[in-house]
Amino acid sequence: MSAPCSDAEQALIGAAFAAGTALNEPFSSGSNPYAGQYTLSGPAKVRDPRVTPIRGDLADIALAGKLFAPHYVVPMERAVTVPFAVLMDSGRSDAGQTSELLRGERFMVLDIAGQHAWGYCAHDCYNGYLALDALGDSAEIPAPALAAADPVAVAQGLLGMAYLWGGRGGAGIDCSGLVQTAFARAGHKLARDSDQQAASAGRVLGDDEAPARGDLVFFNGHVGILLDVETLIHASQGAGGIGGAVVIEPVADVVARKEGGITLRRRVL
């Protein structure tokens, strides 16, 4: 079973939990053999709800003693069995897409209701709902292979892919999804959203440090990857959010369009 985010990852992206023992069954305080070990120890830290697996009725067992919930659940690891599965913000028919999992990626299930499973993505701890029929036994589905040494080359291979909010390369891709996917295939684990990446990916570059291929360049609500010192590859929303795609264009052109210009540069490689 894949472990949830480590303590180091919590510090970087605001994830709310550390690795826990997998028993694959839910339990409340009445049946929890560890119940006496869990006590709240003061005001809880501010936690990013995107990566904190808690609802009004239950939470991941690793949050016991950190956040209160009526029930704590040990997650079950499942794997995506279809080409891609949409992660949604609820189990309703009008739910919005927040991310996407690709074939073989792991999803930690905390609850099943109707046709949906609620839990979090094993690779980045992102919470949400997945269609239950997109998941299968992780023991029978191999995890995606790391097949690239250069994340920039991976991003170039996605040129022309349509922009899709919440996409990671299945039905489409968004700016932070492009960054996360490109670096993941080269063995670098990054957070899901651009603000999380701005807080955690690699190290911040100083104003006196020269740009280099593979650097991440951040704007207000946007991120791209330097192809070279003057050129950016990124998933652009297009004009008014229409016709967006993964494109290569001069950094200066992106700066001219984005209010506030470049807000941050980080280096992972």
Protein language model regions, located:
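Aromatic- and glycine-rich peptidoglycan recognition patches
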Residues: P4-D7, I141-A148, V152, R168, ...
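Short, well-ordered loop/turn sites that connect or cap secondary structure elements
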Residues: A95, L101, L205, A210-P211, ...
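Residue-level recognition of beta-strand termini and adjacent short loop/turns
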Residues: A113-G114, D228
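Catalytic nucleophile-His microenvironment captured as a short glycine-rich beta-strand/loop
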Residues: L216, G221-T231
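Boundary regions of SH3-family modules and the immediately adjacent low-complexity/disordered segments
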Residues: S2-M76, R92, S99, R103-M108, ...
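Short, structured beta-strand/loop micro-motifs enriched in basic residues and often containing a Trp
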Residues: V82-R92, L132, D137, S194-L205
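Catalytic cysteine-centered active-site loop
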Residues: Y163-P211
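A generic structural signal for residues embedded in beta-strands
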Residues: V80, V109, F218-F219
